[in-house]
Regions:
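The feature captures the beta-strand-to-loop junction immediately N-terminal to the Walker
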Residues: 33-35
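Short coil-to-helix segment of the ABC ATPase nucleotide-binding domain corresponding to the Q-loop/switch region
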Residues: 86-95
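A short, proline-enriched helix->beta-strand linker immediately N-terminal to the Walker B motif
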Residues: 146-150
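Conserved ABC ATPase signature
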Residues: 127-131, 135
């Protein structure tokens, strides 16, 4: 379980986050939305131990977060810069496993397993620069999942992709979440995406000193799909509620 108690952050005299308190149960997919520049990414990096020096407390399974937890993985929006262009797709995915005492053949088998999950078996020997943007982001997701993290942080991972590729990866994420059950904190500026993906949506207020202004459970029938789910009356109502909170109306 991930827990935040009265978490805040300052940069000098500038307050970015104020009194953020959350409890995220194991296996929940939590979406965080808010106006541009309100501190969503700062919150995500603080949760992941990437930005030390915060106020309040953050615990993961009861252990205070004072650095990057071992069972954490992060997927960023800028997939092209997060992959090593001189390594093959398989070598990029294997990279996190090198910290573990596993035989080389087992590391390769794990990488191939997750590449199959994300539909990239045929691309294993290619290099990232030979792939489309959507395929590169699939590689980044595969690399994050290969160590079977208990907490996955995703910072607007689909924000720079075209609409069709974005929908494909949203559905891939839902499938992975159903089968793997990791706790996911997903930052997005897209209101529709937050409602489509999330078990719960949290809305941050505009800065400075962003606070939680809405904490909304998302109860939609499953399995979700792009056509049926987005056409549901419940979906439209939830989207409107989140939209009003984001726009402070």
């Amino acid at each position: 379980m991930l827990r935040l108690d009265e978490v805040g952050r300052h940069y000098g005299d500038h307050q970015v986050l104020h009194d953020i308190s959350l409890t995220v149960p194991d296996g929940q997919l939590l979406c965080v939305v808010g106006p541009s520049g309100c501190g969503k990414s700062t919150l995500l990096r603080t949760i992941g131990g990437l930005l030390p020096g915060y106020e309040g407390t953050i615990t993961l399974d009861g252990t205070p977060v004072r650095g990057v937890p071992d069972d954490l993985a992060v997927v960023f929006q800028d997939y092209a810069r997060s992959l090593y262009p001189w390594l093959t797709v398989r070598e990029n995915v294997v990279l996190p496993l090198r910290r573990r005492d596993l035989p080389r053949a087992e590391r390769r088998a794990e990488a191939d397993r997750i590449l199959a999950r994300v539909g990239l078996t045929d691309a294993a020997r290619r290099h990232p620069w030979q792939l489309s943007g959507g395929m590169q982001q699939r590689v980044a997701i595969a690399r994050a999942l290969v160590c079977r993290p208990s907490l996955l942080l995703m910072d607007e991972p689909f924000g720079s992709l075209d609409a069709q590729t974005r929908e494909d990866l949203e559905d891939l994420l839902l499938e992975v979440h159903r089968t793997d059950g990791a706790t996911i904190v997903f930052v997005t500026h897209d209101i529709d995406e937050s409602v489509y993906l999330g078990d719960r949506v949290v809305v941050l207020s505009p800065g400075p000193g962003a606070e939680i202004v809405l904490d909304l459970p998302v109860e939609l029938p499953g399995p979700r799909d792009q056509i049926t789910t987005r056409g549901l009356t419940e979906f439209v109502a939830l989207r409107s509620e989140v939209g009003r909170a984001v726009r402070n109306r």
